[in-house]
Amino acid sequence: MDFHSVLKMAAAKPGSDGIAKRYSLAVGPPKKDPKVKGVDSAAVQAFLRKKDEESRRKETVEKRKKEDLLAKRKELKHDRKARAMASRTKDNFKGYNGIPIEEKPRKRKRSGTEEDQNDNMAAEGEEYMTEEELYEYSQSESEQEEEEELPPQKVPKPAPGKKPPTPALNFNDLLRLAERKQYEPVEVVRPVKKEERLRTAEELKELEFLERKAQKADRKDPKRNEQLVKVSKGSGDKYSSLKGTHSGNSKSSSTEQNGTIRKSSSDTGSRTEKSGSVFHTKESKKPSSAKDLGGKGSRPNVTGDGKDRHSSSQPSAASNSAFGRPSGSARPSGSSGPGRPLGGSGSSSGKSTGGSASGSARSVGGSGSGSGKPMGGSGSGKPIGGLHSSHGSGKPTGGTGSGSGKPTGASGSGSGKPTGSSGSAKSVRESGSGSRSVRESGSGSRSVRESGSGSGSARSVRESGSGSGSARSVRESGSGSGSARSVRESGSAKQAGGPGSGRALGSGSSFARPSSNSSPAPGKPAAGSGSARPSSSGTPRSSSMGHSTSNSSRQPSSSGAVRPSSGPPTGATPKGPSPRPGAGPTSVRPNSTSVPGSARSSLGSGPGRPVAASATGQLAPAKPKCTVVAETISSKNFVPKSINGHMNGIRTAAPPGHRPAMRPPGPPLPPITSSYKRRIDDDDDYDSEMDDFIDDGGECQDEISKHIREIFGYDRTKYRDESDYALRYMESTFREQQKEEARSLRLGIQEDLEELQREEEELKRKAKQLKAAKKMSR
């Protein structure tokens, strides 16, 4: 069946409608209503109406503004003219509307008036113009200026808020302040030691180098150094600077490297001495001073290396007096004699406590040389307890013992040291007569005095070997508490007879320093087993840790009693707050390091003992007086070195003749060994990108350096074995380079001239040869 017949059949079927269905090709109506042009809907018309109104309103506002501005401008113009005229008549013209017009640009105005004076003849119009010009600048700003002017007026008010510097205290105020401060505990700030990463050898070398550099700078500029070092109680410090002793007191903090800050409060500050009256300071009250890390209640802090350092707690008085006193004058112990030159006359320095100034013997307390000051309680050699009066100062130096008076070795005159009762306070007085107290002069054997009381085994061993300059002060603090024995070395210095002979200061005899053990002393708290013995002898020995306790315990009672015996000379016992650990007069400088002349007691745990009581006093006999610089250096240097000695509790003292001050500061340089040598590390230069670099060999280095050596005479292996450290010092400075350049320039010019001369000679020679040749040819 073909398609045609099928269609026919379908059409013929009765069920089918007659209309064939087709897809309409007509386009349907649009989905959106078409816009009708020219017709505004009501909403649109309302919107347009609103817009028109707004624009009209804006215009009116602008018009009004414009009118206001024009009116203002007109007014200002008139004002300006009127003001220009008014300024000529010096009227105070307030604007027409009553608002004063700010005349800000004063300078401009002045220049305008000057112009007026210069050109009196100028036309008025011109003058107005100048005024207008003047004003034109300020007109636009005039309103701003009025607003700006107000704030400046407010600004000045805060400025007065700064308080004017407080007026300097006068001396009496300082004394009062010192009295008040001496009982206040001082906080000791323990340095926080944080773990540092291990450093490479290179870094260590660098640090060492920088340290040395800084120390050199300090040596050159001691004053700056002192300022850094001075951590003094406020008042003490001011006072000390008044006295001019500051150089000394700054010293005490020398061991700052160890990290504990020693308060070098100048003893002067606290040594408030009201002419005659004696103030008793209660040492015991100063817990801080006693504060000691060692665990013994009073032991001064022991820094890591075992060095007792009398931490800052030291009462201000103590430290300064000890070393604060300029070498020239030993202020006898403590304040009493500040002005008195030690060396002065043997007698003066020898002032015996008893007041017998005879000869050079210096009673313990009055350290003629300043170093003799008895330490802490024994302060003036006065027995610490109440006895001080009886045998303390009263005891004539020579007197064997008005005290308990057992003259141990030296016939009565020698040492009248009452051992028994005062026990620790035994003031060993050197007899005024000059006999050496233990007086075994030639033998040099030491007489050992045991102080009677059991607890205090402080025996002051006085090595009187007359000749032995180096009597070594060995102070082992036995148990640490009781037995600190102060070995006093009378050293050669103790030559009784010659006031000048022994001590550099010229006080003839060495000082007897009472080695008072604090414990036995009646006045002393039991705890004070540590001896407060001043180690003032020729080499201040820092007492071993043992006496640590004495520090704090430093006799409270004694405090009252202790009067520096030096007092007698002045007539009133100066009341240095002697009870201070430093026993006012004696300064306890824990580091004896500062003592220049004497062997430095190894940083002594100084607390109890005035180390080096007179910093200058103890110079080795022959040495010149110590200078500020030397003291500064000596005080700072030795900290690191004596560590070993401290650990064992043994203080090693250098012989008195030896001046530590001369040693260069800083830890000793390690020898330059092969470990320092520079190494050429090829690995450091390795670069992975260079692996495929083709090296065609080139000339070998030795070949090249051989030529260089021939031409310039330079050997490149010359410094191969030098350390970086050494090479650092070979670098030339800019000035040296310039000199070198000038020199080479001179040489270059010279060589050029010689070259020119040679060339001229060559030319002449050639000319001659030519002439000769011509003649020959003819």
Curated annotation (Swiss-Prot):
Q: Is the keyword Coiled coil in the record? A: yes
Subunit organization: Interacts with histones. Interacts with a heterotetrameric complex formed by histone H3 and H4, especially when the histone tetramer is not bound to DNA.
Write out the domain note.
Answer: The acidic C-terminal domain mediates interaction with histone H3/H4 complexes.
Biased segments, Gly residues type: 336-357, 365-384, 395-417
Positions of region (Disordered) = 1-21, 50-625, 639-685
Ranges of biased composition (kind: Basic and acidic residues) = 50-78, 190-227, 270-286
> Which organism encodes this protein?
Xenopus tropicalis
Q: Which GO terms describe its cellular component?
A: nucleolus
Q: What is this protein called?
A: Protein SPT2 homolog
GO BP annotations, alphabetical order? heterochromatin formation; nucleosome assembly; regulation of DNA-templated transcription
The annotated regions of Low complexity compositional bias extend over 312-335, 385-394, 418-493, 506-559
